[in-house]
Amino acid sequence: MSLSKLTQTCFSRHQAKTFIRLYSSDFKSLLGPPAVANPYADNGRTRFAPIVPINHGNVFASIKLPINETQEAIAFKSEVEEAPKVEKLEVESPKIEAEKVLSSPPPAPAPTSSAIDELNSLKDSLEKLESAASKSSSSSGGSSDNSDPGNAEEIEARRKRMERNTRIGAYVLFGGSIIGFISFCFYYGRAQRDEFGNVISDEFSGSFLAPFYRIANSFKLWRDYVVEPAREQLLPDPLPAPYLQPKYTIVIELKNILVHPEWTYKTGYRFLKRPALDYFLDVIGYPNFEVVIYSSESMMTAAPVVDSFDPKQRIMYKLFRDCTKYMNGHHVKDLSKLNRDLSKVIYIDFDAKSGQLNPENMLRVPEWKGNMDDTSLVDLAELLKTIHLSDAEDVRPMLQYYSQYDDPAKEFRRRAVYLSQQEEQKKQQPDDSSMLKRYSGRLFGSRRHVNA
């Protein structure tokens, strides 16, 4: 039996090709023996089969073959390879066939039963490796083996325990919510009592739904605490005589008008003082104006900043975020709660949304972003000083006029320069006319202006 037929009977087609390829590399060449030494000539050499990929990409380890099995495989290869070559030589040249027969070595012995047993054992080992590789690949793919009865019982017990804990937690949460709601209604729906334990009557007393009305009123108070200013009257009453109460009140935003917040890795969070701020406060400070800081910043942040740049106490009052009205995500200043006449209130800010409740009192100026070459406060101080000197009974028309410009202070400066030039021209015109009259009298013989 030839080697190819033997392998086909013991292996599948793919495995037979692999086996023949591994053990059929030694053949007799017509050109003579190869120049390279046969590696199987060394009996002490052991050959390792390479890794062979078969069946769904599984990989099998190399198989170490003993020396005696290698020699038998060489004999099988020589028999398989020489038979077709001899037939081909018979067709091409009889002379070469005769020389081949005379010089060919004696035929190899027929395969014995031991070789067949080895091949069968090799096939069994390959099948075992294939099954082991398939199991390892299936386990690495994430499949779980629940065939173990103990493991299945443990999983079922864990699932039941989780269901029980979830059910208990839901019961506790639902019960706690019910108890909390009842306690809330009882606490905020009860009538108030005085120090002696007597019930204080309110507008809801005597009604069957009085507890629910009181609960709704509590919600309204919470909303007002967040949305509305902290008190109805933000400023105290004007100063009585003999103290001097300024005629006009200036309400000014702190952030990005007088100072600018800045954060760096080196200094951290700090506020930059705007150039000419001291001059600005000297011009508008008491007793010229009643200055009020009305900022959307918190008192904890803004109060120390105001105290640091105003050691002379030129700012009379300070109002912070708790005194603003929260509307549509913005902190709005409600000037109607200042306890002052709005016809004499000047509100200075860069954000139009902050003064949306009183736009006629707002003087909108550009936002200062920290540039240290800014001189807008000087021009703004001159504008406010002009309003003070005008002694107007209602400042709102002037504020509305200058608010139509992007930079009211710059527009005021431009108009002030223009008016000063007009005044200079008016002063020069009478001098020129008097000189002409004086010289015209001399030219025409008139002596009326000699003594002038």
Curated annotation (Swiss-Prot):
Any single biological process term in GO: protein import into mitochondrial matrix
Cited CDD domains: HAD_FCP1-like
Region listing for Disordered, in residue ranges: 96-115, 130-153
Gene from which this protein is expressed: scpl-4
A matching Pfam family: NIF
PROSITE patterns xref list: FCP1
The keyword Transit peptide is assigned to this record: yes
Transit peptide start and end: 1-23
Family: Belongs to the TIM50 family.
Organism this protein belongs to: Caenorhabditis elegans
Protein name: Mitochondrial import inner membrane translocase subunit TIM50
Membrane topology category: Single-pass membrane protein
Domain FCP1 homology: 243-387
PANTHER family reported in the protein's UniProt record: DULLARD PROTEIN PHOSPHATASE
Membrane topology (Mitochondrial matrix): 24-167
GO CC annotation terms, alphabetical: TIM23 mitochondrial import inner membrane translocase complex
Cysteines joined through disulfide linkages: none
Gene3D superfamilies attached to this UniProt entry: HAD superfamily/HAD-like
